Design a protein with these regions (language model features):
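PRPP-associated nucleotide enzymes
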Residues: 1-312
C-alpha cells in the first residue's frame, strides 16, 4: 500500500475477527474505536484517533442480529461528524437481503430499507459479497463492489481432486450461481426443485439431472436452518450419489442447523468466514475471505479495477 496514512480500517463488534485478518493482510493496524453499551440496551460509538481527511473503511456484517446494523449506522454517523474524507462500508454478509421484493401483498422490502438507511447515514461506497439477489446493488445510488466467494471456493474444490464431479444447487433459484461453478470447472450441473410448506420448512424435492456414482458439491449462498441443504444431500444419496458435500457463502446457521448438518449425510459443510461460527459441528469448515477483501480495499484506495479480479 503506497500511503497507509490515507486510509484507516475500523471494525464493529460482530466482525472484529475478520477485520483483524484483513488488516494483517494489508499490513496496517486496526483502527482504535470505542463502542459503549448502556444499561438500557443503547450504545454509542466514538473514534479514539483522528480520521480527519482519511478514507475510512468500516467492517461489519449487518446480521445476525439487528444490533449489528444499528452499530454500523452509528459508526458511519460518527465518521461523518469526524470529517472523514470518504466512508466505505465493508459488509461481508448483507443482512435482510432475502427481503428483496414484494412476493405477496402488504409486505416490507427490508433490503431496500437497509440500503436507504446506509445511504442516509452517509456511506460513499459499499463493498459486500454474494448478495442473495444481485439486483440489491440497484437499491444504492453509490458505487457497490460486489465480490464473489467463488474466488475462495473454486480453488478449494479443485484441491479435492474429486472424480466424476457434478455441481448441484439445492433449489432452482440458485441455478445461476451453480452454473458459474460448473462452467468454470467444466463439469455437469444438477438442479433440485423444492416446494415449501412454510418458511424454513421444505416439503418436497426432486432432482433434475444425473447424480448416480457422482461426487456432488452443492452450492448455495446462505445456510440458515439447514433444512434445504441437508434434505438435498439425502435426496442425492438416495439417487445413487457417491458422496455429497456442500459449500455456502454465509454461515447463518440458526438452530437447529448445527444438529442437522452433524446428523446429515453431508461429508462436509464449507463456508466463508463472513459470519463467525462458534457452535460445535465437526463437519463445518470455514475458508477465510480476508485476503480477498484486503485486496479489494487496496484496489479501491489505489483506484484500480476490481471486477477484473473477482467476477468469473
Amino acid at each position: 500500500m503506497s500511503e497507509t496514512s490515507s486510509f484507516k480500517v475500523f471494525s464493529g463488534t460482530n466482525s472484529r475477527y475478520l477485520a483483524e485478518k484483513i488488516c494483517a493482510s494489508l499490513g496496517c493496524p486496526l483502527g482504535n474505536m470505542n463502542i459503549t453499551h448502556f444499561a438500557d440496551g443503547e450504545f454509542a460509538v466514538s473514534y479514539e484517533e483522528s480520521i480527519r481527511g482519511a478514507h475510512v473503511f468500516l467492517v461489519q456484517s449487518t446480521f445476525p442480529n439487528s444490533d449489528n446494523l444499528m452499530e454500523l449506522l452509528l459508526m458511519i454517523d460518527a465518521a461523518k461528524r469526524a470529517s472523514a474524507k470518504s466512508i466505505i462500508a465493508v459488509i461481508p454478509y448483507f443482512g435482510w437481503a432475502r427481503q428483496d421484493r414484494k412476493d405477496k401483498p402488504r409486505v416490507s422490502i427490508g433490503a431496500k430499507l437497509v440500503a436507504d438507511l446506509l445511504s442516509v447515514a452517509g456511506i460513499d461506497r459499499l463493498i459486500t459479497m454474494d448478495l442473495h439477489a444481485d439486483q440489491i446493488q440497484g437499491f444504492f445510488d453509490i458505487p457497490v463492489d460486489h465480490l464473489y466467494a467463488s474466488a475462495v471456493f473454486l480453488p478449494y474444490i479443485e484441491s479435492l481432486n474429486l472424480e466424476n464431479l457434478v455441481i448441484a444447487t439445492p433449489d432452482v433459484g440458485g441455478s445461476k450461481r451453480a452454473s458459474t461453478f460448473s462452467k468454470y470447472l467444466g463439469v455437469p450441473l444438477v438442479l433440485c426443485n423444492k416446494t415449501r410448506e412454510k418458511a424454513n420448512v421444505v416439503a418436497t424435492m426432486q432432482i433434475i439431472g444425473d447424480v448416480k456414482d457422482k461426487n456432488v458439491v452443492l452450492v448455495d449462498d446462505i445456510v440458515d436452518t439447514a433444512g434445504t441443504i441437508t434434505k438435498a444431500a439425502n435426496v442425492m444419496l438416495e439417487a445413487g450419489a457417491k458422496s455429497v458435500r456442500a459449500i455456502a457463502s454465509h454461515c447463518v446457521m440458526s438452530d437447529p442447523a448445527s444438529f442437522r448438518v452433524q446428523e446429515s449425510s453431508l461429508a462436509e459443510m464449507v463456508f466463508t468466514d463472513s459470519i463467525p461460527y462458534a457452535k460445535k459441528c465437526d463437519k463445518v469448515k470455514q475458508l477465510s475471505i480476508a485476503d480477498m477483501f484486503a485486496e479489494t480495499i487496496r484496489r479501491v484506495v489505489n483506484n484500480e479495477s476490481i471486477s477484473s479480479q473477482y467476477i468469473i
